[in-house]
A protein has these predicted regions:
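Short active-site oxyanion
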Residues: 79-83, 102-104, 128-130, 145-148
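Substrate-recognition element of Asp-dependent hydrolases with the DxDx(T/V) motif
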Residues: 70-96, 107, 143
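Short beta->alpha linker loops
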Residues: 88-89, 97, 110-111, 154, ...
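Mg2+-dependent phosphoryl-transfer enzymes with acidic/Ser/Thr/Gly-rich catalytic loops
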Residues: 3, 31-33, 57-58, 65, ...
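Short, electropositive alpha-helical surface patch
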Residues: 92-111, 202-205
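Short, well-ordered beta-strand core segments
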Residues: 12, 82, 105, 149-151, ...
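Active-site neighborhood of HAD-like aspartate-dependent phosphohydrolases
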Residues: 1-78
């Protein structure tokens, strides 16, 4: 039963694209002086820059939902460590991870299971004490080896089929908040955590 699994969770890990975001990736031309201009790249590559030519001339941006940011704070108050594991590399994600004070942030990862096992060793935890939130097939190896596997509402069918819990909201629209609420409520800490969260932001006068 997924509620029983949720009661054991001490670590919550998640993907970024499609989980913290809706999966959309915005690309913008890099500011002048930051990288070589598109024209310079084109000249260097004889007009055939390919994927490298484009990626070196662009900057990546992502959008995040405020509810998911609050979820990280709520998880922390419940004594749950948090972290992200993502295939892409983005300064935007690095900034968001620092802003949210995540315990773990791994980017550029193809083999997510190896990183998952590394984090478990660092934290001194067992697989059944970790939850993972994913949306696509690259997340399945971790989801198959963690205690509570969570799929966002718009995850691929293969991912939903193997999840212990499917969120009400879509990726980038509060899905991580759903996962945190589910876990913290299963542990009987929700009301206490909400009180502590509001107390921190509205101290008694």
């Amino acid at each position: 039963m997924s509620v029983e699994r949720a009661r054991k969770i001490k670590l919550l890990l998640f993907d970024v694209d499609g989980v913290l975001t809706d999966g959309t990736i915005w690309l913008f031309p890099a500011p002048a002086g930051v990288q070589l201009s598109t024209q310079q790249h084109a000249r260097q590559h004889g007009g055939e820059g390919g994927f490298g030519f484009v990626s070196q001339s662009m900057m990546e941006a992502k959008g995040f939902h405020a509810h998911d940011g609050t979820a990280i704070s709520l998880a922390r108050l419940a004594g749950i460590k948090t972290g992200l594991i993502t295939k892409r590399i983005s300064e935007t994600v690095a900034l968001r991870a620092r802003d949210l004070k995540l315990d773990h942030a791994y980017q550029g990862i193809q083999d997510k299971l190896t990183v998952f096992e590394e984090i478990l060793r660092k934290e001194g935890l067992r697989p059944e004490q970790a939850a993972y939130v994913g949306d696509d097939v690259i997340d399945l190896p971790v989801m198959r080896n963690c205690g509570l596997s969570v799929a966002v509402a718009n995850a691929r069918a293969e991912v939903k089929d193997e999840a212990h819990y499917v969120t009400e909201h879509r990726g980038g629209d509060g899905a991580l908040r759903d996962a945190v609420e589910y876990i913290v409520k299963a542990q009987g800490k929700w009301e206490e955590v909400v009180r502590e969260y509001t107390r921190e932001r509205s101290p008694a006068r």
